[in-house]
Each structure stands twice: as C-alpha cells, then as structure tokens.
Amino acid sequence: MKKVVIFDTAIGTTNLGDEIILQCLEEQLAFLLDNCFLMRFSTHTKNMPLSRYFLETPKIQFSYEADFKLIMGTNLLSRNIRRTQSQWPVNRLDSWLYDNCIMAGVGTTLREGKITAYSR
C-alpha cells in the first residue's frame, strides 16, 4: 500500500473555497488515492511542536517514507514566503516536508518584484 501525504489547505482556515477545491481534487484523484494510506498535514498551521522535528515520531517517519506528497488548493505560492507566513508558515526546520511535492489547484499571489532566495 502506497503512503501519501496530503497537505490539507482546509485545516485551520475559514475559507470555504479551500475546502471546495480540496474535495473536488480528491474526487478527481480517487483512482489514485483510494488504495493508499493517507496522512494529512496542515498548510495553514504548524504541524508539530518544534521539539518533534528532532525526534523520530511516526508522523516524521511517515513523511520520510511517503511515496508521494500532494498540496491541493488555495493560493500558497508567493514571491516572498516570509510575508505570507499566516497562509503557509514554512521555515527552515520543516521545509523538507514539502520536498518533491505535487501541487494541484494551487494558485499564487505573485506580484511585481523578484522572487526571494528564501522563497525559492
């Protein structure tokens, strides 16, 4: 059974649009997800206390072993991630969680200007 991490954009937000997009994408990807073991992580809130990143917890282990990771729905991308911390609180300690993610239905708040090195 494949292990899949879903970064759930509907956890920790009152934006109904995030929930609608997520549900639609899950329906469209049911052929892929139905036979998988899923673990959900939030994109809008911290997933674990900082101390948990230094321990080998089941959640951390699952993330390392996941066959693939999906981020589905909402406007997460930005030229400057530090300015959108309430939308997607990524820091250096947990940024590895998002390595090699597949994004579907993810928009951007791109405006004029350069993409910061931190955002890359």
What are these regions (language model features)?
Residues 2-120:
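Aromatic- and Gly/Pro-rich donor/ligand-binding loops
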